[in-house]
């Protein structure tokens, strides 16, 4: 009887929703290839097929840069309130939050997939040679420590933006809206030095 208030208080805190939670009622499907697995809600079927085509092209293109990404699971959260993504090494997956932006174009999904795939390529590139050897000693998350210590996040994101711009007809490097803030700052205040620019 004394445990009931305690148990009720725990159930209340379990109702907090974060990016990674989806409604329990969702039905999930998957597309599997030799290179990737896309896990998605059943109502997202048409776009999941589109994503599979995008990823197949990206995998083929990645070999031209000498990077051969290992198989990865792409988990699609199509029922949330954000458009974003992330890549994790443990467990190896990419999570895509695919709410279209307010001014969606027909390329918004291609843009998101391309950007996050570049992060997959980056982490696979870091996880080779000495880093890979040391990850057997220090664990699977060791490459993330290497990134955190030696590669600034602005470089990781800038590289992903440059990649999304270079591989197709999309990318923020082609978007006046994305470049306007930097152009205005340069015209009004000049080019900031490195220390000020990275703040």
Regions found by a protein language model. Give the residues of each.
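Catalytic Zn2+-binding segment of zinc metalloproteases
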Residues: 117-133, 159-176
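Juxtacatalytic substrate-recognition/specificity segment
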Residues: 14-146, 152, 188, 195-196
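Bacterial N-terminal signal peptides
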Residues: 1-9
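An active-site-proximal "capping" alpha-helix that borders the catalytic cofactor pocket
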Residues: 55-63, 155-168
């Amino acid at each position: 009887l004394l445990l009931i208030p305690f148990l009720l208080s725990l159930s209340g805190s379990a109702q907090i929703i974060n990016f990674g939670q989806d409604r329990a009622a969702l039905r999930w499907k998957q597309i599997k290839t030799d290179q990737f697995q896309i896990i998605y809600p059943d109502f997202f079927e048409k776009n999941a097929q589109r994503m599979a085509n995008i990823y197949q092209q990206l995998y083929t293109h990645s070999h031209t840069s000498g990077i051969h990404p290992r198989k990865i699971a792409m988990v699609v959260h199509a029922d949330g309130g954000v458009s974003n993504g992330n890549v994790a090494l443990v467990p190896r997956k990419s999570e895509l939050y695919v709410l279209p932006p307010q001014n969606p174009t027909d390329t918004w999904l291609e843009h998101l997939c391309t950007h996050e795939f570049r992060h997959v390529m980056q982490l696979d590139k870091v996880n080779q040679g000495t880093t890979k050897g040391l990850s057997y000693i220090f664990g699977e998350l060791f490459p993330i420590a290497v990134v955190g210590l030696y590669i600034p996040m602005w470089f990781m994101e800038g590289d992903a933006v440059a990649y999304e711009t270079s591989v197709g007809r999309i990318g923020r490097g082609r978007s006046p809206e994305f470049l306007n803030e930097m152009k205005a700052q340069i015209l009004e205040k000049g080019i900031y030095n490195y220390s000020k620019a990275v703040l």
